[in-house]
């Protein structure tokens, strides 16, 4: 079995909720299935750079002479203190499978996460390379529900699955060590992505890449592009290219609505 075949739907969910995702994360979900209500989200708090969109400007101004090492250091501390976040992942290139049978490939992911261990998301996937569909998922503490693509009902995953949505923001294993241990950090420039952002590039060590992707990407240092908000020092977007079975897969992650209150509760339509 290949490395990509060792992960499962639970793992990709954890990656996004954390984000890169979720990279990703546990990596977005049950909006289409009505499993939760996010009426408390504040659109004016949007700081993320959603792939393929041009968000409204927040008028942030970045210092072109800023020290890239200091930018990343401040980002590490800011990400350490995150209590909630909305995330969106888009993936292109070689397929990344989320099941052990290598039948379900992840294309997109969108959801929310709150500490210490609540997440919900919607995954856009391709089944057997010819059927596009969406899967919902909800994780609360140690319990995880995944939607059935045929019935739309949620099913409780059996015990034994490794899902820790808080891992992405764990100060020991999540964003903070990834940022503090990046090598060859450079400030590429100042980009307008709904306001000015620091565009930083560096090399993420293999151990941290594996952590934030919950095992989807293994045994490789990865060049990573980050966009960091100059006022909050929060990461608003990340892009990277990984190699799985000698084929490239491209990941684009957007993080937004930090600190918002999200309603995450068990789905009502659960079958055993």
Kindly label every feature range from the protein language model.
Residues 71-77, 108-117, 136-141, 224-230, ...:
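Extended lipid/amphipathic-ligand handling interfaces
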Residues 108-174:
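An acidic-aromatic
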Residues 93-102, 129-130, 208-217, 246:
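Flexible, membrane-facing loop/turn or short amphipathic-helix motifs
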Residues 123-132, 151-152, 238-247, 269-272:
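Short, solvent-exposed aromatic-acidic interface loops
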Residues 2-4, 8-118, 262-272:
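N-terminal leader/targeting segments and the immediate start of mature chains
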Residues 198-270:
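Gly/Pro-enriched, hydrophobic low-complexity segments
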């Amino acid at each position: 079995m290949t490395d990509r075949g060792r992960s499962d739907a639970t793992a990709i969910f954890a990656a996004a909720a954390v984000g890169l995702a979720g990279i990703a994360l546990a990596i977005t979900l049950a909006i289409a299935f009505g499993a939760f209500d996010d009426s408390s989200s504040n659109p004016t708090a949007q700081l993320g750079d959603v792939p393929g969109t041009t968000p409204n400007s927040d008028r942030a101004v970045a210092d072109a002479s800023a020290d890239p090492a200091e930018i990343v250091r401040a980002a590490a501390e800011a990400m350490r203190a995150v209590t909630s976040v909305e995330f969106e992942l888009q993936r292109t290139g070689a397929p990344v499978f989320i099941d052990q049978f290598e039948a379900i490939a992840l294309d997109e992911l969108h959801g929310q996460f709150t500490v210490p261990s609540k997440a919900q998301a919607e995954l856009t996937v391709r089944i057997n390379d010819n059927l596009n569909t969406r899967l919902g998922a909800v994780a609360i503490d140690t319990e995880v529900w995944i939607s059935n693509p045929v019935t739309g009902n949620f099913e409780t995953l059996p015990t034994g699955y490794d899902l820790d949505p808080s891992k992405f923001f764990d100060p020991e294993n999540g964003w903070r060590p990834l940022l503090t241990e990046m090598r060859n950090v450079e400030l590429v420039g100042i980009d307008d992505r709904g306001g000015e952002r620091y565009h930083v590039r560096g090399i993420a060590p293999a151990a941290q890449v594996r952590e934030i992707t919950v095992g989807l990407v293994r045994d490789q240092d990865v060049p990573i592009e980050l966009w960091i908000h100059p006022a909050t020092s929060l990461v608003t977007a990340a892009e990277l290219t990984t190699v799985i079975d000698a084929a490239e897969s491209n990941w684009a992650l957007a993080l937004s609505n930090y600190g918002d209150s999200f309603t995450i509760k068990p789905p009502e339509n659960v079958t055993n």
